């Protein structure tokens, strides 16, 4: 039992939906913490609104509540479960803020719940900018000259006093939200207004900018007896001024002298002792590169993105140990899981280099402002391990899946040196390639060091890589001797990079390696630099020393992971990979995971029998397959990242379980797929590929507007649009053909129908559909951005029977063994197929949890030859549950400047929440509250600007909202419509009219909700865009689909916010 005998039942708060700044790392830390508590015999109650996580599986905690993370709902859970303790530091900023609110509102005291681990007082000292600064002054730790402000005037006065540039850091926000660097008064006004609104306590710290100093982080652990250790120190290649989540980070630090290292280590220990941390904590410093002067930037008094990285970089499980410390254990009483001999009070030592590179979402958002600053914009990250910096760095570049295998980037070849210089000085996501191009043109690296603040050590390494690339370009394959090739491999060059420079194929380089037997050896991550024998099967490749892998003769399967989190391919795929591994283990099969994402559960070293932390490229994966010789490889659960390897593995004669390359081709190749549907007698929306504007207008006439247009090769609906007339279509096609004239544009009849989706399992004879899901928004909104309902609410028995029949026909005709995802449209009583994915999709975790069918487990067994009839869940459609569950998308558009907010066929959401209720309206209410979409309890003002196609549909919704007390403000057209219907409305001037106009009332937050249905193709598109952006940046709700507004109105009519009897449901029953 734990040392503190009073702890029997602990409430753990999760981090909610995935947003930029708070991603899968909290699923990893939360899962670890729950398992650590359970291993001590403690009852664990979990509340988290995110259904896509492993953490919310019924095996992870004893009671699981997928409920909104708000005071009212968490209080309901506490009242029902009566936990004696609360563990706050596992749910990121969301969990921390909620714990502070529960304490301040008296709820914890009312139910007699103690906070274990880091106390609320310590959290406040770490998070409240003023308390933290005062404490630093008390213990003599230097902080940057700063001022706490709570209004605009005080901020402008302070900036004038200390001089620009100044850094703005709001209190209690996530990923630097609302912060930034202001170079002048105008910029400061904008950033400060946003920061004061986003801070939960309306407090912002303004500090003198030390842009250009080094940024260094220490990950520190402390127990309640005051024992402290530093787990890992990390150095950002990018200097202060770029958020650490958007920086390339290296561990351990490469450029600190021993004196600097010890000085900052001592400071971190002083700080966490003073704050009184019990558990893990991250301390960030800025260090003057030219002296020993340093300053404390901030601390995170909880597990964080950096602690997930430190855990994976060292093999030291920070979250697990933080949970044990919360129970009263000391660091000297907890065994190191990797060595089983040493204790947690041993500081890890690293005999390798780790590099983390962020993954940004700009491929989804062409118009976005890509400049990096103190506000985080990356959705995910990759990590790479190497024997030296160059190796880890080049592995990292090819792990990003941006089609780059070296530092050579065609885009920058055309740029002038002055243009390259401006990119490097105002960095964006591609700055590293611009920097390499400058070096390629013999720009002096000491001058690059002066303009960027990047340390000479890193610039020298990058220069070496660029020089080798140039040397290869001037050589032929005959010039490549054994020594040179071996040296390039040691430094991380891939076969493809070498081949591209030599203008030969990667196979040619591979053959040379084979002849000279230049093969990778795999080293173990062992926490102790090889001093003790390690038991962790956690490996990375190098071309250096001897091999540490023991290859068994057992039956074994390799599961390919999904790589970094991005829009369209999120944590859902990690969920599927982990469940696949668990299913294989139950069958007694040795499991091996290959993945490169440090935030996820799949890369926790005790999930699989072996973990290879490697890039998911053809070469890196093949090396592991050749080493391990598995009985099969599973690609179905790793999203597009894994599916992309199918053809390559087929060419190498490697067995893939479940889906084959030919089956993928049949579903993804438009012509083959059309032929298949024709043969099976299944309808799809009419359409074809067109090659010119004239042909497009002709086809649209034949199909009749509206039509759906999109480029032919896309993922996540990139570049799709619905056009309503010739003007809109012409505008789209002119732009599309200007961007790419080599491929056709697909044009389909747009059916304004109901969208239906299924994830099914097929064994080649029968299929099982765990549940038929219905989308709330009509077709045309990407399935990942739609509210999804299960059981379906409006689908007739006839259509359900058609869904089953079509799914069965398709699965059997394609020859699926395992998973298939199909999307349908029901239009005027007919069913049409719009898309088939022969793999797990992003709805798998949701439908698994709400139907109770362990989809991935069953699909894995089927891939290995089991039949559905033997597995205990029947065939065809599984029985529907009593409760209704909705999945509501969550967006991070606020964090990405200049990005479109309106919903359409291109996916934009980063995460999701679940709402569970006795009926659909109850479920929707909880879903909207959990996704922060529910308008305020005080029925406020709605700003409505509705386009001409939508006015008739908008009117009855407006009447309902007016009946519960909402007031309307609208521009002339919508205003006339509402007045005529007898709805009270105030008219507001349009953007191009005199002030105060529509934009001013949004900027001054004089409304509570903006309803704007976008028009396309003309200038009002820009007006609508400006209004939507202004609203999102000021934390106002924005709704662009009337189906969503209809649902909100239905929920409002029920007056749930006055109803105190809403139940919370434990889904682990």
Curated annotation (Swiss-Prot):
GO terms for cellular component: cytoplasm. Mg(2+) 4 binds at residues 835, 837. ATP 2 binds at residues 710, 749, 751, 755, 780-783, 823, 835. Residues 550-932 are annotated as: Carbamoyl phosphate synthetic domain. It catalyses: hydrogencarbonate + L-glutamine + 2 ATP + H2O = carbamoyl phosphate + L-glutamate + 2 ADP + phosphate + 2 H(+). It is an enzyme of class 6 (ligase). Its cofactor is Mg(2+); Mn(2+). This is Carbamoyl phosphate synthase large chain. Pfam families: CPSase_L_D2 (PF02786), CPSase_L_D3 (PF02787), MGS (PF02142). Residues 1-401 are annotated as: Carboxyphosphate synthetic domain. Its EC number is 6.3.4.16, 6.3.5.5. Residues 932-1069 form the MGS-like domain. Mn(2+) 3 binds at residues 823, 835. PANTHER family: CARBAMOYL-PHOSPHATE SYNTHASE [AMMONIA], MITOCHONDRIAL, CARBAMOYLTRANSFERASE FAMILY MEMBER. Belongs to the CarB family. InterPro entries: ATP-grasp, ATP_grasp_subdomain_1, CarbamoylP_synth_lsu, CarbamoylP_synth_lsu_oligo, CarbamoylP_synth_lsu_oligo_sf, CbamoylP_synth_lsu-like_ATP-bd, CbamoylP_synth_lsu_CPSase_dom, MGS-like_dom. Large subunit of the glutamine-dependent carbamoyl phosphate synthetase (CPSase). CPSase catalyzes the formation of carbamoyl phosphate from the ammonia moiety of glutamine, carbonate, and phosphate donated by ATP, constituting the first step of 2 biosynthetic pathways, one leading to arginine and/or urea and the other to pyrimidine nucleotides. Composed of two chains; the small (or glutamine) chain promotes the hydrolysis of glutamine to ammonia, which is used by the large (or ammonia) chain to synthesize carbamoyl phosphate. Tetramer of heterodimers (alpha,beta)4. Pathway: Amino-acid biosynthesis; L-arginine biosynthesis; carbamoyl phosphate from bicarbonate: step 1/1; Pyrimidine metabolism; UMP biosynthesis via de novo pathway; (S)-dihydroorotate from bicarbonate: step 1/3.
């Amino acid at each position: 039992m734990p040392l503190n005998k009073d702890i029997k039942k602990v409430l753990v708060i999760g981090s909610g939906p995935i947003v930029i700044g708070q991603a899968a790392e909290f699923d990893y830390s939360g899962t670890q913490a729950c398992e650590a508590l359970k291993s001590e015999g403690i009852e664990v109650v979990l509340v988290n609104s995110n259904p896509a996580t492993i953490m919310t599986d019924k095996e992870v905690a004893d009671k699981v509540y997928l409920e909104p993370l708000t005071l009212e709902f968490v209080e309901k859970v506490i009242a029902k479960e009566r936990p004696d303790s609360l563990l706050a530091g596992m749910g990121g900023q969301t969990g921390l803020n909620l714990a502070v609110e529960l304490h301040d509102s008296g709820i914890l005291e009312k139910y007699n719940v103690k906070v274990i681990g880091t106390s609320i007082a310590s959290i406040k000292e770490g998070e409240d900018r003023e308390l933290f600064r005062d404490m630093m002054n008390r213990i003599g730790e230097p902080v940057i000259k700063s001022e706490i402000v709570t209004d605009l005037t005080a901020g402008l006065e302070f900036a004038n006093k200390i001089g620009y540039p100044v850094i703005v850091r709001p209190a209690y926000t996530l990923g630097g939200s609302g912060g930034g660097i202001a170079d002048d008064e105008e910029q400061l006004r904008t950033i400060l207004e946003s920061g004061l609104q986003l801070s939960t306590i309306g407090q912002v710290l303004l500090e003198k900018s030390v842009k250009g100093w080094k940024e260094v982080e220490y990950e520190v652990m402390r127990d309640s007896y005051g024992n402290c250790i530093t787990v890992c120190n990390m150095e950002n290649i990018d200097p202060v001024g770029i958020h650490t989540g958007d920086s390339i980070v290296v561990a351990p630090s490469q450029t600190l002298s021993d004196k600097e290292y010890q000085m900052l280590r001592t400071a971190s220990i002083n700080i966490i002792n003073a704050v009184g941390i019990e558990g893990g904590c991250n301390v960030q410093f800025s260090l003057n590169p030219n002296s020993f002067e340093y300053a404390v930037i901030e601390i995170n008094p909880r597990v964080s993105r950096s602690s997930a990285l430190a855990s994976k970089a060292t093999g030291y499980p920070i979250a697990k140990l933080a949970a044990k410390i919360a129970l009263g254990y000391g660091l000297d009483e907890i065994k190191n899981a990797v060595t089983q001999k040493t204790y947690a009070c041993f500081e890890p030592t690293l005999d390798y280099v780790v590099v983390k590179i962020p993954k940004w979402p700009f491929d989804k958002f062409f118009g976005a402002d890509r400049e990096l600053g103190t506000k985080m914009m990356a959705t995910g990250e990759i990590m790479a391990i190497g024997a030296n910096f160059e190796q880890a760095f080049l592995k990292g570049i090819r792990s990003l899946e941006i089609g780059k295998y070296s530092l050579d980037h065609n885009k920058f070849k055309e740029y002038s040196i002055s243009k390259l210089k401006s990119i490097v000085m105002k960095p964006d996501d591609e700055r590293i390639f611009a920097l390499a191009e400058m070096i390629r043109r013999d720009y002096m690296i000491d001058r690059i060091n002066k303009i960027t603040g990047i340390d000479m050590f890193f610039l020298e390494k990058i220069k070496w890589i660029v020089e080798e690339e140039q040397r290869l370009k001037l050589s032929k394959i005959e010039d490549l001797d054994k020594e040179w090739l071996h040296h390039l491999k040691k430094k991380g060059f891939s076969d493809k990079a070498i081949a591209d420079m030599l203008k030969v194929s990667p196979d040619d380089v591979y053959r040379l390696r084979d002849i000279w037997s230049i093969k990778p050896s795999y080293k173990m991550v062992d926490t102790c630099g090889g001093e003790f024998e390690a038991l962790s099967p956690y490996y990375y490749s190098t071309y250096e020393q001897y091999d540490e892998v023991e290859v068994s003769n057992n039956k074994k399967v390799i599961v390919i992971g999904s790589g970094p989190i991005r829009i369209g391919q999120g944590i859902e795929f990690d969920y599927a990979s982990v469940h696949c591994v668990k299913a294989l283990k139950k069958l007694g099969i040795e499991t091996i995971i290959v993945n490169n994402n440090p935030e996820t559960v799949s890369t926790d070293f005790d999930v699989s029998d072996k973990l290879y932390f490697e890039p998911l490229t053809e070469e890196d994966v093949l090396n592991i397959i050749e080493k391990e010789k598995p009985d099969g490889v599973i690609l179905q659960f790793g999203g597009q990242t894994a599916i992309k390897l199918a053809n390559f593995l087929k060419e190498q004669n490697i067995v893939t379980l479940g889906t084959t390359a030919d089956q993928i081709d049949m579903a993804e190749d438009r012509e083959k797929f059309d032929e298949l549907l024709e043969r099976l007698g299944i309808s799809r929306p009419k359409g074809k590929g067109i090659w010119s504007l004239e042909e497009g207008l002709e086809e649209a006439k034949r199909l009749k507007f509206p039509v759906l247009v999109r480029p032919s090769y896309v993922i996540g609906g990139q570049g799709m649009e619905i056009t309503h007339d010739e003007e809109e279509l012409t505008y789209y096609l002119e732009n599309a053909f200007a961007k790419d004239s080599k491929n056709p544009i697909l044009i389909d009849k747009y059916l304004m129908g109901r969208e239906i989706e299924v994830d099914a399992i097929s064994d080649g004879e029968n299929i099982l559909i765990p549940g038929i899901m219905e989308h709330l928004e009509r077709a045309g909104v990407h399935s990942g951005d739609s509210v999804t309902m299960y059981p379906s609410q409006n689908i007739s028995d006839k259509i359900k029977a058609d869904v089953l029949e079509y799914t069965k026909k398709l699965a059997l005709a394609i020859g699926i063994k395992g998973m298939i995802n199909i999307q349908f449209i029901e239009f005027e009583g007919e069913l049409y197929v719009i898309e088939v994915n022969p793999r797990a999709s992003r709805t798998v975790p949701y439908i698994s949890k709400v139907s109770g069918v362990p989809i991935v487990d069953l699909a894995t067994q089927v891939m290995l030859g089991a039949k559905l009839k033997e597995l205990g869940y029947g065939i065809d459609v599984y029985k529907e549950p009593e409760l209704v569950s909705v999945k509501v998308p969550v967006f991070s558009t606020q964090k990405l400047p200049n990005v479109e907010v309106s919903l359409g066929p291109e996916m934009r959401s980063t995460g999701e929440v679940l709402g569970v209720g006795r009926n659909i309206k109850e479920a929707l209410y909880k879903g909207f509250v959990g996704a922060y979409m529910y308008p305020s309890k005080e029925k406020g003002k709605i700003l409505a600007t509705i386009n001409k196609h939508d006015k008739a549909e908008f009117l009855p919704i407006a009447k309902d909202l007016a009946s519960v007390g909402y007031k309307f403000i609208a521009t002339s057209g919508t205003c006339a419509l509402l007045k005529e219907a007898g709805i009270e409305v105030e008219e507001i001037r349009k953007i191009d009219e005199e002030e105060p106009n529509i934009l001013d009332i949004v900027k001054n937050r004089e409304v509570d909700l903006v309803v704007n249905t976008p028009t396309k193709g003309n200038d009002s598109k820009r007006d609508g865009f400006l209004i939507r952006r202004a609203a999102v940046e000021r934390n106002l709700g924005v709704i662009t689909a009337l189906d969503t507004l209809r649902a909100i109105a239905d929920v409002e009519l029920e007056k749930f916010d006055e109803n105190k009897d809403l139940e919370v449901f434990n889904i682990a029953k």
